[in-house]
Structure formats: structure tokens, C-alpha cells
């Protein structure tokens, strides 16, 4: 938990009455309070309802109030008051600004923050993930993104989103963004159309490529190219090519965690989009060629209770044999310290029978610890997992591999530096 200093506590109480009329449906008051204080500290735009106030005028009013009460002297000092207790903090003077949608516990945020970016708005529906996000990033994310008007979101250079895979209507790809109505992707597209950031990074499971026989991916890309965005698949292919051709070209967007210094066989699709006319192209990162092994992420003295019981171990082995016979997959993945990688860690770790198990000489294998799950996703040891082990496994399983985000963020940052 964060130990807030007196200035931060007083500032929160002081601005709360002003915040209340700007809180969107299904979001906490604390989310707007945090966003305002962070916006002052990082010189970013306020989230606000434009029907009530203009963002810059509201920000000036709040800063004036804080100054009058001795809570604000300089931005640098206020930055230290706001972020001083955080182990993972942004830079005082950011190179670019981004928003973090479907944020989870902030894995995507970390990758961009450590490359000089600052988060100006975050959104996450799950209350447990929100709390972990707060403990590490100092802010409660806004809630249901479908209840937040796009024009109220602060200006940003990069939109980041890891969204669920949902099918679209087969009405005929005739209505553009309206073809996506009723899906969470529609809200992402609406924000892109309204705010027009220079870049967007959309992360999803590799299965998005084959989802609904490639139709889902085609709708996503066609919708965004019609809004003025480009990706590594040519526009004429997206508009007139077959779904098979799009699927083939989309394979370049799939990156493996093990190729970027993390011993986990996790594959995800990372759709990088840029504003046509502002950015010429984007080259996906190549594997780093770093040799890794599972032992790199293991703790020296794991808790004895991580070792699984005889009954559980026998059940795992029996189900693995049965699954293999029935062609249902092979269940758990048993690895040693010398193994080059684990299988993919999932949000249902230790519930679906496909978990990572660590071999132990002379005794039953063991589960990985929450800290090891964090390391398998590239989270630094300074990151504070949920106090609930069930939630910690779920949150890391649902997250991204920070190392992969880091290399993508570096490339996007370099292009933005060239533009700016």
C-alpha cells in the first residue's frame, strides 16, 4: 500500500467537492481525484465534462486553490508529493502522453512509462485489478469505458488497449465504425476517431487472427483504416483482399515473449496503428537473440507449501494421459531450471490443469509463486502483487509481457521524437 504524505491527503480532500460533478457513471470519485492531481504533477490535461467546465480553466482554478492553501509551490515539488511514495514512477518531463484502456494491472503502462511516456488516463472494470493498479501507479483507473464520453478523455499521443475478442455482425462491412457497435472495440474506435492520437497499440490473443475465420480482424483493420489510420498491412489489401491474405500478413504482428528475454512461450498479436500522413511506417521488432532459461525467474527459497500433494500430482498425470488420448491438449507443463521456457501462464492458473509446474528432485513438483508469475511477465520486483494469491495469479495471467511492450514502446517513442 502507498503511504500518502500530508500534502497529498490535504490536496485530495480540498479538490473533492470540485470533482464530484465530473465523475462519469460507474467510475469512482477517487479516479477523477487521482487523475487531476497526476495531471497537475505531469503538466497534462484534466479529465472533465466540457458542458460544465473547460479543461484548462478548471486546471488553473484547482492549482490556484492549492497554491492559496500552501499545497502547491512548483510543479517539481508537487510531482514529488504525488509520486514520491511510488517505486515505479513516471519522469517529471515526459516525451509523450498515452492512455491505458482495459488496463488490468498496468503492464502496458510500465512498458511505455519506462520509455519516457506518461499516462494521462486509465480505465479498468475489475475492482481487484483496480486496487493493484492503485498500489503500483498511484491512481484508481476509471471504470466502464462504455460509460465515458470520448470527448472528455484527455489529449494523448498514443492509445493503448488490450481488448476482448468479440464477434461482429456479418451485415456487410458497409457502415464503417457502426459495424462494430455493441462491442468494446467500438469504444476504442470511437476514442480514436474523436481524439486522433498519432499512434495506437492494440493487444490481443493470437487467436484474433483466426477468430470468425478472419472476419473479426478484417472488420477491425477496415474500420481503423477508414478513420485515417495505417498499419503494416496495405490499405488496398484490407479493403479488397481476402481474409486469408490479411491473416497471412498479420503474422508479422505476432510476437513471442521468449524472443524478448522472458522464458515463457507466450504469443500475442500487437496491432500497431499510426495516423496516415503523420507517420510513414513502423517496423516490428526482431527477436533480441537473448538466451534465457526458466531458472532466471525462479526464487531461491520457494515456500514449501507450493509443492503439490501426492493426490494432486497423481490426478495431473492421469488427466494428462487422458487428454492426450482424447486429443484435448496435454495439460500441465513440467519444466526444470534449465528449460528454455514455460508454457503460457493463464488467468486460471492452478484451476484449468494447464499450469506451469517446476520439477523438484526427490519430491513432487511445485507451483510457481506469484513473484515468479510476475517475472514470467517481465514485471520488475518492485511491482507489488495483489495480497490475494488467487487474484495475483489471475492478474499476471491476464496481463502482457512487459519486455515485449518495452521494445514496441521504444520504436514508437523514437518515431514520436522525430515528429516532435
Language-model segments: which ranges?
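C-terminal target-recognition/interaction regions appended to catalytic cores
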Residues: 1-89, 311-420
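Core alpha/beta nucleotide-donor-binding catalytic domains of modification enzymes
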Residues: 64-218, 222-225
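Short alpha-helical patches at coil-to-helix transitions and adjacent helical residues
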Residues: 105, 217, 268, 398-406
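Short coil/loop linkers at secondary-structure junctions
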Residues: 118, 230, 291, 380-382
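Residue-level signal for pocket-adjacent positions within structured domains
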Residues: 140-143, 163, 172, 179, ...
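Class I S-adenosyl-L-methionine
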Residues: 148-158, 168-344, 348-350
Amino acid at each position: 500500500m502507498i503511504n500518502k504524505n500530508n500534502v497529498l491527503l490535504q490536496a485530495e480532500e480540498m479538490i473533492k467537492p470540485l470533482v464530484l460533478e465530473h465523475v462519469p457513471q460507474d467510475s469512482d470519485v477517487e479516479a477523477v481525484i487521482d487523475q487531476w492531481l497526476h495531471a497537475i504533477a505531469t503538466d497534462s490535461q484534466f479529465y472533465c465534462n466540457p458542458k460544465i467546465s473547460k479543461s484548462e480553466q478548471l486546471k488553473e482554478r484547482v492549482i490556484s486553490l492549492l497554491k492559496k492553501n500552501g499545497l502547491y509551490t512548483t510543479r517539481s515539488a508537487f510531482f514529488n508529493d504525488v509520486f514520491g511514495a511510488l517505486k515505479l514512477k513516471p519522469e517529471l518531463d515526459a516525451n509523450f502522453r498515452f492512455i491505458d484502456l482495459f488496463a488490468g494491472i498496468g503492464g502496458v503502462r510500465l512498458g511505455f512509462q519506462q520509455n519516457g511516456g506518461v499516462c494521462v488516463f486509465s480505465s479498468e472494470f475489475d475492482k481487484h485489478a483496480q486496487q493493484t493498479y492503485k498500489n503500483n501507479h498511484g491512481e484508481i483507473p476509471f471504470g466502464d469505458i462504455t460509460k465515458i464520453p470520448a470527448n472528455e478523455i484527455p489529449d494523448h499521443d498514443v492509445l493503448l488497449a488490450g481488448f476482448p475478442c468479440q464477434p461482429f455482425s456479418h451485415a456487410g462491412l458497409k457502415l464503417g465504425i457502426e459495424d462494430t457497435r455493441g462491442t468494446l472495440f467500438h469504444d476504442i474506435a470511437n476514442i480514436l476517431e474523436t481524439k486522433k492520437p498519432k499512434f495506437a497499440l492494440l493487444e490481443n490473443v493470437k487467436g484474433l487472427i483466426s477468430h470468425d475465420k478472419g472476419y473479426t480482424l478484417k472488420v477491425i483493420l477496415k474500420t481503423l483504416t477508414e478513420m485515417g489510420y495505417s498499419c503494416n498491412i496495405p490499405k488496398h489489401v484490407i479493403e479488397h483482399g481476402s481474409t486469408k491474405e490479411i491473416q497471412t500478413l498479420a503474422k508479422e504482428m505476432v510476437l513471442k515473449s521468449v524472443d524478448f528475454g522472458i522464458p515463457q512461450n507466450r504469443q500475442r498479436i500487437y496491432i500497431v496503428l499510426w495516423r496516415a500522413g503523420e507517420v510513414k511506417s513502423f517496423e516490428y521488432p526482431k527477436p533480441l537473440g537473448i538466451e534465457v532459461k526458466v531458472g532466471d525467474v525462479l526464487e531461491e527459497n520457494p515456500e514449501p507449501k507450493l509443492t503439490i500433494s501426492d493426490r494432486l500430482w497423481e490426478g495431473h498425470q492421469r488427466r494428462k494421459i487422458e487428454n492426450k488420448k482424447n486429443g484435448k491438449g496435454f495439460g500441465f507443463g513440467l519444466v526444470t531450471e534449465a528449460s528454455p521456457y514455460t508454457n503460457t501462464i493463464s488467468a486460471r492458473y492452478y484451476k484449468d490443469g494447464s499450469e506451469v509446474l517446476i520439477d523438484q528432485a526427490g519430491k513432487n513438483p511445485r507451483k510457481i509463486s506469484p513473484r515468479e508469475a510476475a517475472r514470467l511477465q517481465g514485471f520488475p520486483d518492485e511491482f507489488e502483487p495483489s495480497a490475494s494469491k488467487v487474484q495475483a495469479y489471475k492478474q499476471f495471467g491476464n496481463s502482457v509481457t512487459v519486455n515485449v511492450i518495452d521494445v514496441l514502446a521504444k520504436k514508437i517513442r523514437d518515431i514520436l521524437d522525430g515528429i516532435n
